[in-house]
Amino acid sequence: MVSGHSLSRRTMLGGVFALSAASTARAQDLTKASIALLRLSSSGPIFIAQEKGWFKEAGLDLTLKDFQAAAQVPLAVVSGDADLGVTAFTAGFFNLAAKGGLVVVAAQSAERPGYQLNVIAVTNAAWDAGVRSVKDLAGKRVAVTTVGSSVHYSLEVVAKKHGVDTKSLTIVALQTIPNMVAAFKGGQVDAAVFPITTFRQVEAEGSGKPIAYVGDEVPWQLGAVFTSPKTIADRRPLVEKFLVGYRRGAAAYHEAFGKRENGKLVPGPNYEEMIGILSSVLKQPPALVAAGLPFIDPDGRLDVGDIYKQVAFWQSTGQVARDADPKAFIDLSFVQGHFNVPGK
């Protein structure tokens, strides 16, 4: 005779094993994928979706691969080290894409009014000498990370808006943000284009003054989600599953951080949870994270025409091949409702 206690225990254990088997089966059903990225707030939708389990709900077992420099991210996708990538546009990115190595599928961050993401700042000495606006930069030494970078592009488009020919500037490429900070504080340059979180630390030390916030001056499509043509051809469902999770993350990010009034962030209803996730992932205090949150479209929609504009600019400087055609490396089929699509 089997006691009620033994039966209930067996039933319970059977249920546990069944749940475990079901979980294992679900895990085996997940598509394995990897994404190359920088551990910055602009990757926020990915961190949020990963933390909330939204990629798994979409059927994806996603591995995040961290890199230290933007140039490394598209190279990881081209080489096959990662299935997907997300980072800022650069001249190097467009050259890789033009050679058939990359396809843009959705938006990442963008410069927009009210989002103090990147800033053109001047040293105290330059300020005291009368450099108080972008127009005053003519003839000055301005630090950027690398020639062809998104930082360099920011300087170019803001200078153009104010009628400053960048040929009149001495653009000093210093490779890294710490090198830029050292040159700025040491007086080797008169100005620099800094990420806002870096500049706030410089400013707090009394070492510089802001003269222009890039997003307020010239809104532009800063970055994108991309993959390889081979991944789209052979594993399209992988990209589709990723974008389901990514867009959930982007929507949650936008709900928390997407409202601005008079250039100031107005926290959304899920702000505390989202800033907590990003603070933990980025290993930064919430206040510092909040100071550098970019605009990210909640649906992953691109400003397509602006990408064409960027390619044309880099072509005019000789840094991107003349035969590079954005239409060939932007796939509009994964996300609906992209903005400013040429020919529409």
PLM features: residue spans?
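Short helix-loop capping/hinge motifs at secondary-structure junctions, enriched
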Residues: 125-133, 230-239
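Periplasmic-binding protein-like
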Residues: 110-119, 203-231, 235, 243-246, ...
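Conserved C-terminal helix/tail region of periplasmic/extracytoplasmic solute-binding proteins
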Residues: 307-344
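Short, hydrophobic alpha-helical packing/hinge segments within bilobed ligand-binding/sensory domains
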Residues: 73-76, 91-92, 179-183, 199, ...
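Short, glycine-/small- and polar/acidic-enriched structural segments
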Residues: 28-164, 171-174, 190-196, 213, ...
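N-terminal secretory signal peptides and thylakoid transit peptides that target proteins
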Residues: 2-19
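Sec/Tat signal peptide C-region and signal peptidase I cleavage site
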Residues: 23-27
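Secondary-structure end/capping motifs
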Residues: 233-321
